[in-house]
Amino acid sequence: MGLANLSFLYNTLVLEHAKSPHHYEANLPTNGHQITLHNPTCGDTINVSLQIKDGYLNDLCFNGSGCTISQASASMMTDTLGGKSTDDAQKLIQGFLNLCMGKPISDELKQGLQDAAVMGTVAEFPARIKCATLAWHAVQDILNQQK
């Protein structure tokens, strides 16, 4: 892996989200839904908390530790999914997972992913796919438990 490829993965937007993650809470709220997921490959741990009220995701936040990619992706995930309906959140999550696997997604879905669309670059770095998708899988797991 060349240095040019690494700079493609660790672009300015990713580094900004990792350095100052949005919706990061040292102490997660105890009400609502919570889940913790681990990525043993990289050592990432993500704790996600959210409330579902009237079919919408509210108070979406996270904490945890891990690599730059996992922390940046979790930050982007909270920006993207917060306030969305559960149906829209599921579509965005699936679109994000497809993007990270190198599968094509619609321009509309890519636009809906906001900053998170830059994470599509992890498709070229298979070892980083789990890092990028961990927080998204956490919310997906919570939503699937609600069905």
Predicted regions, residues:
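Short, thiol/selenol-centered motifs that function as redox-active sites or metal-ligating centers
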Residues: S65-Q71
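Alpha-helical macromolecular-interaction surfaces
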Residues: Q71-A72, K91
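Alpha-helical support elements that line or immediately flank enzyme active sites
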Residues: S73-S85
